Amino acid sequence: MCLMSLGIAVPSAIAAPSHAPAEAKAYIISPADGQTVSPEFTVKFGLSGMGVAPAGIDKPGTGHHHLLIDVDKLPSLEDPLPSTTQIKHFGGGQTETTLELPPGEHTLQLLLGNYSHIPHDNPVLSEKIEVTVE
């Protein structure tokens, strides 16, 4: 009976959001909002008020970045973020990436996820920026 209780409790613990301090802030260091970039360019991620930890590491006050590319409607903030062509996961704790996008206007935004890719109970979401790819 004890094992059955554990089996029921574990999934809810895994699916639980983590808490982020109110002052936590995610931001894109570069490129700048409105910048024109080459088809291949580097995006540098910023985070203040929290630390970066790889996915799978359940350490309070930490998370890892997810880059939202051309996302008009945010995904569920209560479930693990899906990995798609528009939602890039950086579960290794990376703080930058090189993107290759087609010419035109694009939007970029960061969303911090906890150890199981779930956004924090008070989501740490950057401002959305726009870039123009040459």
Residue ranges and their predicted role:
Residues I57-H65, L125:
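Short coil-to-beta strand junction motifs in C2/discoidin
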Residues L74-S76, G113-V124:
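Short acidic/polar inter-strand loop motif in beta-rich domains
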